[in-house]
Design a protein with these regions (language model features):
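The catalytic Nudix box helix
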Residues: 48-49, 66-98
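A glycine-rich, hydrophobic loop/mini-helix early in the fold
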Residues: 35-67
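A structural signal for short, well-ordered beta-strand segments
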Residues: 38, 67, 98, 116-118
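Nudix hydrolase/Nudix homology domain
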Residues: 24, 61, 73, 100, ...
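Short, cationic motifs built from Arg/Lys/His that form the positively charged side of catalytic pockets
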Residues: 52-54, 83, 135
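Acidic, metal-coordinating catalytic segment for phosphate/diphosphate chemistry
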Residues: 2-37, 43
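A short, polar/proline- and glycine-enriched secondary-structure boundary/capping micro-motif
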Residues: 29-31, 58-63, 137-138
C-alpha cells in the first residue's frame, strides 16, 4: 500500500471524527485531520531535528521536528507518536509527554497537531525513506536558525517553535 492509499479520520474543528478519507482526498480538499510531532531531546538538552526527504508530499527538504506523521483512521495520537518514533528514528520504549496542541489551520495543512517530547540518549537510526539527514542541535542553535532562516523549516515546526521550544530556558 502506498502512502497515498492511507486512510485518515476526517475531523471537525473540535477534533471529533466526522468521516474517513484517503490521504490524497484529505490533502487535495483541505479536510481537517490529525497528526503528531515528537521532539526528541538528549540528556544535555539538545534537540534532534530532521530534514525531510525530497520525496515527501508535504514540505520536502525542510527541517522539521524529530519525528512526525499522520494519525491513521482508528488510531489515537499517542499510538501514532510511538509508531512514528519507531518508523522514523528506530526509537522505542521512551516516555512521551504531551506538551502542546495546535488546532487545525492552513499553516498546519489542516491538521490538528499534538506535540510530544521525550528525553533519551539512545542511538538514533534515521529512516532514509522519510528523512534525508538529522542531528542534535543546542537550543541556542535552533533559535539562531529560526531567526536567520525561518524558511528552511516546516510551517508546523515554526508554530511549535513559537509556542513551545522558544519558551524553554
Amino acid at each position: 500500500m502506498s502512502e497515498y492509499d492511507e486512510i485518515f479520520d476526517v475531523v471537525d474543528s473540535e477534533d471529533m471524527v466526522i468521516g474517513k478519507a484517503s490521504r490524497l482526498q484529505v490533502h487535495n480538499n483541505d479536510l481537517m485531520h490529525r497528526s503528531v510531532h515528537i521532539l526528541v531531546f538528549n540528556s544535555t538538552g539538545s534537540l534532534f531535528l530532521q530534514k525531510r526527504a525530497m520525496i515527501k508530499d508535504e514540505s520536502p527538504g525542510l527541517w522539521d521536528s524529530s519525528a512526525a506523521g499522520h494519525v491513521e483512521s482508528g488510531e489515537d495520537y499517542i499510538s501514532c507518536a510511538k509508531r512514528e518514533l519507531n518508523e522514523e528514528l528506530s526509537l522505542s520504549d521512551v516516555q512521551l509527554d504531551e506538551v502542546l496542541f495546535i488546532p487545525a489551520q492552513s499553516t498546519t495543512f489542516w491538521e490538528h497537531v499534538r506535540v510530544y517530547k521525550c528525553v533519551t540518549d539512545s542511538n538514533i537510526c534515521i529512516n532514509k525513506n522519510e528523512i534525508s539527514e538529522g542531528r542534535y542541535m543546542k537550543l541556542s542553535e535552533v533559535r539562531a536558525l529560526m531567526q536567520l532562516n525561518p524558511e528552511i523549516h516546516t510551517s508546523t515546526f515554526s508554530l511549535i517553535y513559537a509556542n513551545y521550544i522558544n519558551k524553554l530556558g
